[in-house]
């Protein structure tokens, strides 16, 4: 059972898909400052050790997407891809937050990432016009 999705809530960098992919691109000094802060261990899977968070961010950068797999809420999966809008650094992320069992019955993580990439490619020109 999930403890609930939280629309509109600001998710922490160490336990959110969007946070991981956005912070993966950040300047080392800024990242170091953030990693020195205390981070809450929401679930058993939540990484709070700065070295573990760093590994997760590096993994996100290498894969091209951020993922949180029950790190915030039990039974919840989130995946996010960066949106660059012509810049070197992402300005936002687009992603999904879903009940893990339900979404993985229909799609693999790779399929979700592919669909999110297509969505990003479709919305980027619209966002660039704004």
Model regions: which residues?
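Amphipathic alpha-helical effector-binding/dimerization core
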Residues: 1-37
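Non-catalytic alpha-helical scaffold/packing segments enriched in small hydrophobic residues
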Residues: 17, 21, 30-34, 52, ...
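Residues embedded in well-ordered beta-strands
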Residues: 20-21, 77, 93-95
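Short, basic/aromatic recognition patches
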Residues: 35-80, 121, 126
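Sensor-regulatory modules in signal-transduction proteins
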Residues: 83-86
């Amino acid at each position: 059972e999930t403890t609930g999705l939280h629309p509109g809530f600001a998710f922490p960098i160490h336990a959110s898909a969007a946070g991981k992919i956005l912070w993966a691109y950040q300047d080392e000094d800024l990242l170091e400052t953030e990693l020195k802060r205390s981070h809450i261990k929401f679930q058993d899977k939540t990484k709070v050790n700065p070295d573990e968070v760093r590994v997760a961010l590096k993994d996100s950068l290498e894969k091209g997407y951020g993922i949180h797999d029950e790190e915030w809420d039990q039974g919840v999966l989130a995946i996010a891809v960066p949106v660059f809008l012509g810049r070197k650094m992402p300005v936002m992320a687009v992603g999904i937050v879903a009940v893990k069992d339900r979404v993985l019955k229909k799609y693999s993580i790779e399929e979700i990432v592919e669909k999110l990439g297509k969505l990003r490619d479709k919305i980027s020109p619209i966002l660039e016009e704004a």
